[in-house]
Amino acid sequence: MPWLQVRLAISPEQAETYEDALLEVGAVSVTFMDAEDQPIFEPDLNTTPLWSHTHLLALFEADADPEQVFAHLRLLTGAELPEHQAEVIEDQDWERSWMDNFQPMRFGRRLWIVPSWHEAPEKDAVNLLLDPGLAFGTGTHPTTALCLEWLDGQQLEGTQVLDFGCGSGILAIAALLLGAREAVGTDIDVQAIEASRDNAQRNGVADEKLALYLPEHMPAMQADVLVANILAGPLVSLAPQLSGLVRPGGLLALSGILAEQGEEVAAAYAADFELDPIVVRDGWVRISGRRR
């Protein structure tokens, strides 16, 4: 069915006021959107930052009168409205639209990431079937791609691989399909653990091949290979811990790092690893090396 969509151009200071007012006048959903393609990276803990120029989108039943909505908003806020507009939009199958846009992707020489509902383009390739679930990694982001390509270029046969911050499990599962003996995944999010388990089952990975833990339950270990696609801040603060999780002679690959953060992250690992040249893609970097 169609919907009435109301759009307001607001500042961060106005966000809560207008969100509450829109819900008060009958909006069935309220969404914040970036108005100027302004990135927000690594916000402070316990904060939910907004862009300096934000669009607030609200959906109403199609028979709602936009002029009445605007009048009630003025009454509730006691102020003239910021820039605003209303339009009727047709309903669509958002999940199907997203699925149609998620296509198989190749990484390196052997590895394909294939949506679970899609046929693999190369039957004889290493095909990882993925249902990302709750917006965990799909391979479309440059940092995930950098890690997948790195894994494809390693000799993983017989190794134990640790995926630190496993998300969808895409890196751990890829390592297993590329020949790793076993993999360990850890994440602070219980839903990530479940997504990883589901994706492992979808790819025929035996339970004993992939162990999944919340960080507080992960056993002491030293892996042959560690991959961590998280954020620069945690990578720096956790450098002693992550370095200790790699055996001497073992391999490390890190991403989730902005280009301007690369040198700082590399410096945090330089004492313990012989580092490779930093690889840059679309403003993001990968740092890799071998444990001394």
UniProtKB/Swiss-Prot annotation:
Gene that specifies this protein: prmA
Family: Belongs to the methyltransferase superfamily. PrmA family.
Enzyme Commission number(s): 2.1.1.-
GO MF annotations in UniProt: protein-lysine N-methyltransferase activity
Gene Ontology CC terms: cytosol
Lineage, broadest ranks: Bacteria, Pseudomonadati, Pseudomonadota, Gammaproteobacteria, Pseudomonadales
Catalytic activity: L-lysyl-[protein] + 3 S-adenosyl-L-methionine = N(6),N(6),N(6)-trimethyl-L-lysyl-[protein] + 3 S-adenosyl-L-homocysteine + 3 H(+)
Binding positions (S-adenosyl-L-methionine): T144, G165, D187, N229
SUPFAM superfamilies referenced in this protein's UniProt entry, alphabetically: S-adenosyl-L-methionine-dependent methyltransferases
Organism: Pseudomonas putida (strain W619)
The keyword S-adenosyl-L-methionine appears for this protein: yes
NCBIfam families noted in UniProt: prmA (TIGR00406)
Function per UniProt: Methylates ribosomal protein L11.
Keywords: Cytoplasm, Methyltransferase, S-adenosyl-L-methionine, Transferase
Transmembrane domains' residue ranges: none
One biological process term in Gene Ontology: methylation
Compartments, as annotated in UniProt: Cytoplasm
Identification of the protein by name: Ribosomal protein L11 methyltransferase
Entry superkingdom: Bacteria
